[in-house]
Amino acid sequence: MAKKDYYEVLGLQKGASEDEIKRAYKRLASKHHPDKNQGSKEAEEKFKEINEAYEVLGDDQKRAAYDQYGHAAFEQGGGAGGFGGGFGGADFGDMFGDIFGDIFGGGGRGRQRVVRGEDLRYDLEISLEEAVKGTTKDIQINTLAHCDSCGGSGAEKGSKVETCPHCHGSGRIRRQQGFFVSESICPTCHGSGKKIEKPCRNCHGEGRVHKKENLSVKIPAGVDTGNQLRLAGKGAAGENGAPAGDLYVVIHVREHNIFERDGSNLYCEVPISFATAALGGEIEVPTLDGRVKLKIPAETQTGKLFRMRGKGVASTRSGYAGDLICRIVVETPVNLTSEQKELLHKLEESLQGKDLSKHAPKSSGFLDGVKKFFDNLGKSDK
């Protein structure tokens, strides 16, 4: 009887991702597990098919061989690479596991692998002021915690917990398929290495339950968008009582209506009046520490930069603060009265003529350049 396509068994397309394969396996294995379908031969066979499919598709090397050669890659006595003999079905994975296990303190069988829980991610948005000064934020995360009823064992109190007879407590099965030595999660105990007489009613034998947890996160001064804060042991609890993973808080700093940040420096545009630009004066500039006086020299133009040292963001590494860089924008007056317009006309007239290059050198230079351009253009037409 021809074997079914492994992707078809898991209800997937050939290009399925690792996560999709893992999710499909967990869903189908739970649905067709013998404990939930006692006495059903059909469910038992389906369960075996699911585990066999995942054993291949869940391993990158074996999946690549299957995609290229199909089931022939795992047949005894040969396969894709032309190897013969099949070594009489000996399980070399177990053989080497036992040898090296003895050398390093323990056999290859009977040892359950302790796998800590999953790492979690939490995206946290803060203001620029909070990023610069540092703050403490209260957050709530969705996580997996060890079941309080069974202490993470997955068994009802007083229930027998025995070593899984299929994997001998290791939680994994090794076998040879063709020229591959495979290792997969034990289909009987799902990797726990244990056989539970009565599963915990609270967690249904999983040992973990979904939970909302409130945490207080200290944000150090100087953080920026993309920085990650690691909270060790605040991730999901591990299976079978294993330690929890970590929580990574990813920082996102909101845009500010005045300042722009580039590393440890802050930038802002400072508008000044036409008169202040021409005559000079003193203005107030906003900083994250409050208002600061800034002297504007006479004849200041738009685009002039003023650097206020130490008014930026303190580096999380060196502790030294960057600078605040102010870019001047000379504001053109609007909504003028007739009298104000008349005064500006008189000022304009007084600046024209022979003294234009003295009072407005850029305008004078521009007009001279335009005149020369058209003069040369006229000569080339002749």
From Swiss-Prot:
Its main location: cytoplasm. The gene is dnaJ. Zn(2+) 1 binds at residues 147, 150, 200, 203. CDD domains: DnaJ, DnaJ_C, DnaJ_zf. PANTHER family: CHAPERONE PROTEIN DNAJ, DNAJ HOMOLOG 1, MITOCHONDRIAL-RELATED. One of its GO terms (biological process) is DNA replication. This is Chaperone protein DnaJ. It is found in: Cytoplasm. SUPFAM superfamilies: Chaperone J-domain (SSF46565), DnaJ/Hsp40 cysteine-rich domain (SSF57938), HSP40/DnaJ peptide-binding domain (SSF49493). It comes from Haemophilus influenzae (strain ATCC 51907 / DSM 11121 / KW20 / Rd). The lineage of its organism: Bacteria, Pseudomonadati, Pseudomonadota, Gammaproteobacteria, Pasteurellales. Binds 2 Zn(2+) ions per monomer. The J domain is necessary and sufficient to stimulate DnaK ATPase activity. Zinc center 1 plays an important role in the autonomous, DnaK-independent chaperone activity of DnaJ. Zinc center 2 is essential for interaction with DnaK and for DnaJ activity. Participates actively in the response to hyperosmotic and heat shock by preventing the aggregation of stress-denatured proteins and by disaggregating proteins, also in an autonomous, DnaK-independent fashion. Unfolded proteins bind initially to DnaJ; upon interaction with the DnaJ-bound protein, DnaK hydrolyzes its bound ATP, resulting in the formation of a stable complex. GrpE releases ADP from DnaK; ATP binding to DnaK triggers the release of the substrate protein, thus completing the reaction cycle. Zn(2+) 2 binds at residues 164, 167, 186, 189. Residues 5-70 form the J domain. Homodimer. HAMAP family: DnaJ.
